[in-house]
A protein has these predicted regions:
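Intrinsic low-complexity, intrinsically disordered or marginally ordered coil/linker segments
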Residues: 1-192
């Protein structure tokens, strides 16, 4: 999950400082079995004044950055996205606005609360050879799939999904595939 915070600069610097100090410690605040034990989300939960047994915090953070007026980091977690950690951050820092983009391949969800695309503009993940990529519009997706299958596709969701279905039915090459995932735009409170 990728996360961005905007809002009160003092609160942003406070959160950034806590996370930076946690990841720069010689030993983790709380002993744990994670690969990056100092960046375990449970350390942040404890630093924010809550018992790590009360908040789902299975995972770590990475790529912590404070640039201009935006604090950002990524999380890697198992079983589910760490939305409860974000809820705790919002409780401790109520003047920060949280934007996220969460992908759960194993959970088969693609979520964002960034309606305007301020930080996370991608609305589609297109997985097909040679690699997967992200697109902001259905027009871009239709153009890319059309180039892959060798024909023009009307830039609508219905036409794109119909072209994918037709390709899947007629394609015999096991190395040729098209998987399209669409990000659902949700309110932050909906994921809690």
């Amino acid at each position: 999950m990728s996360v961005c915070f905007v809002g009160d600069r003092r609160q942003m610097r406070s959160l950034y400082g806590k996370m930076l100090r946690l990841q720069n410690r010689k030993r983790p605040l709380v002993e744990n079995g994670f690969y990056y034990p100092k960046r375990w989300l449970g350390n942040l939960v404890v630093r924010l004044g809550t018992d790590c047994q009360e908040v789902y915090c299975r995972g770590t953070w990475d790529n912590l950055r404070l640039e201009k007026s935006v604090l950002s980091f990524c999380t890697e977690s198992a079983w589910q996205a760490p939305f409860e950690v974000l809820q705790l951050i919002q409780k401790v820092y109520p003047r920060l606005e949280i934007f996220f983009s969460a992908i759960g391949d194993g959970w088969d969800f693609y979520l964002t609360n960034d309606k305007e695309g301020r930080f996370f503009s991608s609305r589609f993940e297109l997985d097909m050879p040679p690699e997967n990529d992200y697109y902001d519009t259905i027009e871009e997706v239709a153009e890319r799939i059309g180039a892959y299958i060798g024909r023009d596709i009307e830039p609508s969701k219905e036409a794109v999904y119909a072209a994918i279905d037709e390709f899947d039915e007629t394609n015999e090459d096991m190395d040729a595939y098209i998987n399209l995932k669409e990000f659902e735009v949700v309110e932050f409170w909906e994921v809690l």
